[in-house]
Amino acid sequence: MTKDFDVIVLGAGINGCGIARDLSLRGLKVALIERHDIAHGASSNNTGMIHGGIRYLQYDVATTKESCTDAGYIERIAPHLLMRIPFLFPVFSGEPVARLLLEGVETFFEAYDYYQPLKGGKKHCRLSRNEILNLEPGLREDVIGGVTLDEWGVDAFRLTLLNAIDAHENGTDVRTYHEVVDFVQNASGAVVGVKLFDRRSKTMNELHAPITINATGAWGPRVAAKLGIPYRLRQGKGVHVVFSHRVSNLGLIIKGVDGRQMFFLPHQNHTVIGTTDDDYYSDLDAPLVLEDEVKYILQAARHVFAGIDKHRPSYTYVGVRPTLFGWGKNEDALSREHAFIEHQIDGVDGLISIMGGKLAAYRILSEEVSDVVAKRLGNQAKCVTHERPLPGGAHLDEPKTLSELVLKRRYGQRAIAVQKLGTETVCICENVSDGAVRYAKQQEFANCLLDVCKRTGLGLGACGGLHCLHTASTVFMEGANVAVSNRFAELKDAMDTRFKARNMVLTGANLQTEELSRAKHYLTGGLHRLMSEAAGKKNIQFTPFSFSPAQSQLTLSKENN
């Protein structure tokens, strides 16, 4: 049987992309397969922090040390994606033995200081009541003191994407929207390839390699089950609530009514609050944000930041973590370590499954797995992912303008390539240009409008995409000969996805206003009419068109039936 590749990696989340990058940099021929888009699951639906895992210090010191070490590497290879977030652990007079608690928190943070140098972090400091209220006047006034904490925030989606791009630029065949329907096995039962269904072209194809890596995250057991291999995870559902602006000056460590620790943090130009952590047994492909989960998060925020009700949440998001299985523990106490299984122990050689892990430790996990794979294939090249910058991460100049700063935060050194493709503003809320839309299509594996949204932040602002998605769609479809029905189906999918994320945090008059605004944009763009028209005419084609707030213009070329 022909060997198409040395290694097939299933799953383009942070671990899959990290492994593909590591292996390709060692000179191996790699295929990276993803059923949806890059970073579809928990890799983009997390808190967005490369933190050292202070919450794990109580249960899991090894994970804290590992996370801090890898956070230091990530800060050096992707400085344009990381931002320093100063946190505060506030203590209030209403807490049981508040003064004693404050002393205990400081002692705990002193222990964490030991690991801070590994990630370029700053040591803690203790603040008085007056110092805290000067820095964060929105806090409850009965705060008696607090302790600071230094952590890194990150654009988690782009971190995953840049690993995929670097892998691709070093020879990896990246295939998104390809679903594994079966494995190819030889006479002895070893896995020697995969059968794939291309979800866009609706075609089947087959790839072969001596080693396949199952890095599909929470979907891992489902993939392994195709071979009759049982293994268990504790899938954990995590929900976040997002505000489209900065509510606080500092990140805050807060607690839910049940004592669960959460983060309340300024993240780029947004505010993110979360996460919940609950065992999850339902549909992995369609986890839903529940009203009770939103209320739980906002209740925790309100408990320390009374002014939160003056701000309107913008949207929510949810992810499912592939946490290592453990019986008899609550979700917080589960290990965030990672592991991998070589399935020859199950009688199926050629397959390795990845389990557990966390964003901050993805690079170390990738190195460990790649070391094993390289050894099995007789490859003696060493890992270089801890010292080689990710795309755009080398030789950064200081930005001279705000717009340049935004570009460099997303693209680093490659911002100039984005500017060459266009500088007209498409999205005012997130400062997205037409060049960024074109760059996503040409260089970042964007296959549809929703893919562009994930790469650029389109639609994450206060308007929910209603003011920018039409224009972005026009730019994205430049020069394409695509059926009107497909063109508008993509636009509708992007708008509906954004509305779904906003729906759970909008109530009363706000929800009614949102629905009226959506209806207006559907009508202004003629979306409802054209979708109906396209359904009745098989051969309608479109050429690029543009929308303006006052009038929408559309040029259609029709073939007579």
Model features per residue range: what roles?
Residues T2-G13:
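Beta1/beta-strand and adjacent pyrophosphate-binding region of the FAD-binding site
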Residues L10, L207-G217:
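Short hydrophobic core segments
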Residues G16:
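N-terminal Rossmann-fold NAD(P) dinucleotide-binding loop
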Residues S24-S44:
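Glycine-rich FAD pyrophosphate-binding loop
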Residues G48-L135:
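Dinucleotide-binding Rossmann-like beta1-alpha1 core, especially the glycine-rich loop
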Residues V147-L207:
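Helical element adjacent to the flavin cofactor pocket in flavoenzyme catalytic cores
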Residues D166, R232-V239, F243-S248, K255-V272, ...:
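C-terminal catalytic lobe of FAD-dependent flavoproteins
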Residues N214-G228:
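Flavin (primarily FAD) binding-site architecture
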